[in-house]
Every structure is written in C-alpha cells, then in structure tokens.
C-alpha cells in the first residue's frame, strides 16, 4: 500500500486586515460569473454600435484679415493704427441668430422629414439593409395655428404621388413638383426617393428652435493665439446636409461682414441720392434768376475787379463745402479738442473771415454789379456743389463695389470620411471594462454580505462541535442533477456514492463519522439518530443515506426513515418504490411492521416518504409516529431519520423529541455562522440537544487557500 499526503498551508491573516489574497481568490472562484457578465456587456456594446445612428463631422476654415482701411478721410493723415479683429467677438458673431437664421431660411431647415421606422432598432436595421438613403425633399410646409400640435404623416404611393394625413383628421393627396393646398395646409414636395409604402413624418419647427439646434451642433475655435484663423466644425447624421449647412454658415458670415463694411458707403449713397435732386433744383432756380436779370438789364458785363472778387468768393464757397464733408468724416474719429479737428476749424474760420472781406468789397460796388455778382456766385457755387456731390457719389459707388470685407473662406466645408461617433472600439472596450468592474464588485459584495463557513475552526471557536468535515466528491458532483428554483440551486443525487465509488474521500470521511457516532451514541437514550440540516440543498440526504450504507456494511441492521414528506427522494436514490410510505403509515393506511422496504444494500432498509400529505407536521405529532419509532428502535441496530431543514419547517423539532442523538448538516461556504447558531437556538428552545455539526461539501477555495491549510490524502493499493 502507498500513502500520499499533500499539505497546502499559508499564514492566517488578521480579521481586521484587508486580505488581498482572499479577494483575488473570491473573484477566481466566481470567474464564470465575471466572464458571463462581461460578455453580456460586450455583446450589448456590439449591438449598440451596430444600431446606433452614426454621427459625421464637417469642417471649414475661415481667415479674419486685418482691416484694409478704406476710409474717406485717409488724406487727413491721422487715422488709428490697424488691429486684427477680436476672435471672441467674431466667434459669437458666427453663432449669432443673424448668421444662423439666414442659414435656416436658405436651406429650409425649419422643415424636417424623418422616416418612420421601428423604435430604437429601426433606423439601424435600415442602414444594415441599405435603405438609409430613402428621402423625401420638402421645400415648403405651412399649417394653420390650430394644427400646430398635430403630427403630419406623408405616405409614399410611388415616385410621383403621395398622401398627407394628420392625427387630427386631415387628409390630402399630392404630387411631387406641385404645391398642395388644402384647409390652410401648404406643402411642396420637390422629389421622392423612397419605395412605395414608406412613411415619413413632416415637422415644422420654429426658426428659433432650429437656430438653437445649429448652435448645439456648431463648434468654432481659434487656431492659435491671435492668429485670425477660425476653425468651424459641424456634426450631424446626414453627410451632405452638414456640409451644406456649414458652407451656408461660412458664406452668410462672410456676406454679413461685407455688408457691415459697406454699410457706411451705402448710407452715404442713400443720403446723396436724396440731396442731389434738391441741389439740382436750387441750381436751376439760381440759373433762371441770373438769366432773367441779364435779360432785364440787357446782359450787363462785370468789370475785371468785380469778376476777380466773384471768382474768389466762389472758390471760398467750394473750399467751405469741402471742409463740411471733411468735418463730417473727422467727427466720427475725433473730438473738437483734437489737433486735427482744431486745424480744420481754424481753416474754416479763416475762410469765413476771407469771405466776409469779399462781401464787404461787393457791398461797395454799384447795386447792379452787386446783384449780378450775387446771382452769378449762387449759380457757380451751386454748380460746384452739384459737381462735388456727383463726384462723391461715384467715389462711394466705387467704394461699395470694391469692399471685400475682412473675412476670407480659406477651406470650404468638407465632410470627413470617417464616423465621428460612436467610437466602436472605445465603446466595446469601455463596456468590457465596465462589465468586468461591476461583476467583480458584485462578487466581492456578495462575498462580503453572505460569507459562508469556510473552516471547521470557525464553528469550534464559537463552541460548536464539528463531528465530521466531508469533502466535496467530484465523482458525485458529475452525476448530480441541478435545478435552480427561485435563484436557489437544488442538488439531487442519482446514485449512492458508497455504492458507486466506495473509495471516494467523501466516503472515507463518512466512515470516520461512523466511528465518532459509535462513541457519541453510547450515552444516548435510544439508537435513533436524527439527521437535519440548516437550510435546503446542503447535502443532508447525501450524508444520511451514505452514512446508513457504510454502517450497514459493518454487519448492523440499519433503517432509514425519510421524514421529509414534502421533498424527500431517498426512494429514488436507493431504487425502491414510494408505495405505502411514511405518510400512509401515519394516517393508518399501512402496517408498521411491514413498512420497511429492503434496498440493494444488505441489512439496509428504507421507509420512503410516501405520498405528499397536506399536513406533514401534524402527522409527525401523532401517536402513530411514536409507535413507528419505538418499533424501529427495537428491530434495528440503528435508526436514521432524515428530516427537513430546521430553518424551513418545524418537522425536525417534532421528530427530535423521539430520538436519542441529533446531528445537523451545514454546507461549506454556503451556510453562515449566524444560520448555524439560529438553528441550534431553535433546537435548544424545543429542548432538543444537538450533538454537533457535520460540515459538508468542503472544497479547496481559491479565496481560502491560504487560511487554515488544506490536506489531500490518497491511500490506494500498490500497482502490481
């Protein structure tokens, strides 16, 4: 014979310390849960990336040039130094209602046409099937105020015809390319690119609402510090539409800049257009008066001296008119205390003084000459003013036409080839990480709040005797059937381990229990042993049946009574029928002396549970059950009673009054210390002493590997 002993041990950590090894071990034990939850998250992310609406991005580049300085007062020589425009102000201007509102009007963005698809997944499915390009182009859509809250649906009949209806009862039939007018509703469909039967929802948004949407999707940033170059980015679902929108925004921004720069010239032209007819009218009146005076005085000629005075006066009036224009320009730049403004005023005063002197010389002339000089001066001054206005008008027209503004579109809008979002790789990776984190946290929390007994030492430290520690049988586990009921796993043995694999370590542990029971029951009042459990599905029936089998192998007559009249299945495990079982005996339908049924194991008999009664607890309290126990105790060397869990029903507390020894089964890493203590407390309240606890299904846990040590034994025959 050969014997092998393997010991795995590690130091015990303090209870107040964070045991990293235990945490890692707990995660390793629940690795399939972690992998499963992580896989579910990853699959959800993959499905999302397939069905999520792709968002595209278009960008354009705009340069804000320095002011070219096209002022009409450049000849003054004291203009301010040119500076680049403030980028922040220009960014706000691009995002203003002035610019975006014109884009909404130009592209009819206040009219939205969306295809009706299955919620959530419909649009994604259409993209996968290649039907995402079905559209209906609507350029005009208006409805009365009383229909503002109604939903309008456009149903495609073919590539030319359609019907328009609303949830308010409106219905009409239209044709592409023709204006539909009915009951105050006007609709212009330019083109239909959709299969017959397709439905679209036509919505009319407010201009302000669409401007807000444009502002949310538009991003304007400055490239560099005070570089004067702005980058415009617009995001959306339609590749072509976002490009057109961004081009329209850039173009409208440029146009408003030009309009702003030429606004001064435009206002001056409007003023001149108003003044020129009046000046021309006054000139005509002056010419008529001069001609009439000459005809009346027979064409009086002026002497050379008077003519020189007249020329000087006309010249001074022309200079005064020119100064008037210059003063209008310079007053926009400076105050009257500025040197340039003061120089102009001094020049005007000098001309006024000179004009006053000339008027004095005219006064000294004869009356006829005075009148002819005055009339001639009015005509010539009027002619000069009129010509100055005409010249100024031409200059302003040239200025207006030559205004290019400060904005230049460097790069027109173009849609980037890739998808901006969703980022499939990042989403899937993030889902995997999230699933991994949540599953690990869930496993650790479950382990923290539901920590089962992981060592016999835990029970012994609290004064609870451990009669046996039965290891988990991999052989039995492979043959067990498992059902999950309300989240709880129900294990059911299909073959007795003591018969199928008698050398299993679990059977060796049960044989050790058999030896311990021999001494434990020496002082008992009878030879009846009750086996109960803390909770369901902990292997109580497994321990009880195999214990009965190994005891019967010592040439002792053993009777196993299945008192679990609700869920007992020992008759299936031992291969007997369930006829005339315990429930029939207790209600008087069966004979006690013939109730025991032999099993395939010698000296091992069984009383099955019988048919499920409506009142198992009441039957166990009957005198009939006491008679059965007394008869069994007299006719067998050992009587084992398999009872339901004490925390589930009270059957064990009733049966315990008839037995001499009671043992309780707890499952390793499943039942908690609190559950064991509560179970013992219930037996104590009913006056039933419990000899000890059997810790069942012990296995080497990754989380407990380093705590109390783990032993593996092999003891087999030598190979020959």
Curated annotation (Swiss-Prot):
Changing residue 668 to F: No loss of autophosphorylation. The chain crosses the membrane at residues 32-52, 425-445. Dephosphorylated and activated by wzb. Residues 1-31, 446-720 are cytoplasmic. Its main location: membrane. It holds the Pfam family AAA_31. Its EC number is 2.7.10.-. GO terms for cellular component: plasma membrane. GO terms for molecular function: ATP binding; ATP hydrolysis activity; identical protein binding; protein tyrosine kinase activity. CDD domains: BY-kinase (cd05387). The modification Phosphotyrosine is found at residues 569, 708, 710-711, 713, 715. This is Tyrosine-protein kinase wzc.
């Amino acid at each position: 014979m050969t014997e092998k002993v393997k010991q795995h041990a590690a130091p015990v950590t303090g209870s107040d310390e964070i045991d990293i090894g235990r945490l890692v071990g707990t995660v390793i034990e629940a690795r399939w849960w972690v992998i499963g939850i992580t896989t579910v998250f990853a699959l959800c992310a993959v499905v999302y990336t397939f069905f999520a609406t792709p968002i595209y991005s278009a960008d354009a580049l705009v340069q804000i040039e320095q002011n070219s300085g096209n002022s009409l007062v450049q000849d003054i020589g004291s203009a301010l130094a040119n500076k680049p425009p403030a980028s922040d102000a220009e960014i706000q201007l691009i995002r203003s209602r002035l610019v975006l509102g014109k884009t909404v009007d130009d592209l009819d963005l206040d009219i939205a046409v969306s295809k009706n698809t299955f919620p959530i997944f419909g649009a994604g499915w259409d993209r996968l099937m290649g039907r995402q390009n079905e559209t209906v182009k609507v350029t005009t859509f208006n409805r009365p105020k009383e229909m503002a809250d109604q939903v309008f649906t456009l149903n495609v009949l073919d590539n030319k015809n359609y019907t328009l209806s609303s949830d308010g009862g409106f219905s009409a039939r239209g044709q592409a390319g023709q204006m539909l007018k009915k009951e105050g509703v006007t609709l212009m469909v330019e083109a239909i690119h959709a299969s017959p039967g397709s439905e679209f929802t036509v919505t009319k948004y407010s201009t302000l609402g669409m401007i807000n949407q444009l502002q949310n999707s538009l991003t304007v940033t400055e490239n560099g510090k005070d570089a004067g170059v702005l980058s415009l980015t617009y995001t959306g679902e339609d590749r072509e539409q976002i490009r057109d929108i961004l081009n329209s925004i850039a173009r409208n921004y440029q146009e408003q800049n030009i309009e702003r720069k030429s606004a001064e010239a435009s206002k001056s032209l409007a003023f001149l257009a108003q003044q020129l007819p009046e000046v021309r009218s006054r000139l005509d009146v002056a010419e008529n008066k001069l001609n009439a005076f000459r005809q009346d005085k027979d064409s009086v000629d002026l002497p050379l001296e008077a003519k020189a005075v007249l020329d000087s006066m006309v010249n001074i009036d022309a200079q005064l008119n020119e100064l008037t224009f210059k003063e209008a320009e310079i007053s926009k730049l400076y105050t009257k205390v500025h040197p340039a403004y003061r120089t102009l005023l001094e020049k005007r005063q000098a001309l006024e003084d000179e004009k006053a002197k000339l008027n004095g010389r005219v006064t000294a002339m004869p009356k006829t000459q005075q009148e002819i000089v005055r009339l001639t001066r009015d005509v010539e001054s009027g002619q000069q003013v009129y010509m100055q206005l005409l010249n100024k008008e031409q200059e302003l027209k040239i200025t207006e036409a030559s205004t290019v503004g400060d904005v230049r579109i460097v790069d027109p809008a173009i849609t980037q080839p890739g998808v901006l979002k969703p980022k499939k790789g990042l989403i899937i990776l993030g889902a995997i990480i999230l699933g991994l984190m949540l599953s690990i946290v869930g496993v650790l929390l479950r382990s923290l709040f539901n920590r089962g007994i992981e060592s016999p030492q835990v029970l012994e430290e609290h004064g609870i005797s451990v009669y046996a520690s039965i290891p988990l049988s991999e052989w039995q586990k492979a043959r067990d059937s498992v059902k999950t009921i309300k989240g709880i796993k129900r294990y059911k043995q299909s073959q007795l381990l003591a018969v199928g694999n008698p050398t299993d370590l679990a059977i060796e542990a049960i044989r050790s229990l058999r030896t311990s029971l021999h001494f434990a029951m020496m002082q008992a009042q009878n030879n009846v042993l009750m086996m109960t459990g803390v909770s369901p599905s902990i292997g109580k029936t497994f321990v009880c049946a195999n214990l009965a089998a190994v005891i019967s192998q010592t040439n002792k007559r053993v009777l196993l009574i299945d008192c679990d009249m609700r869920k007992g299945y020992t008759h299936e495990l031992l291969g007997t029928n369930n006829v005339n079982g315990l429930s029939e005996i207790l209600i008087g339908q069966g004979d006690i002396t013939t109730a025991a049924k032999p099993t395939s194991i010698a000296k091992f008999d069984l009383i099955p549970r019988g048919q499920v009664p409506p009142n198992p607890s009441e039957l166990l309290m009957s005198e009939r059950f006491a008679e059965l126990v007394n008869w069994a105790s007299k006719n067998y060397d050992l009587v084992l009673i398999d009872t339901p869990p004490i925390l589930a029903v009270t059957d064990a507390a009733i049966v315990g009054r008839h037995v001499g020894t009671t043992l309780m089964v707890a499952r390793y890493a499943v039942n908690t210390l609190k559950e064991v203590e509560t179970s013992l407390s219930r037996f104590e309240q009913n006056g039933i002493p419990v000899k000890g606890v059997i810790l069942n299904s012990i296995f080497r846990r990754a989380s407990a590997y380093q705590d109390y040590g783990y032993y593996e034994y092999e003891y087999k025959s030598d190979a020959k």
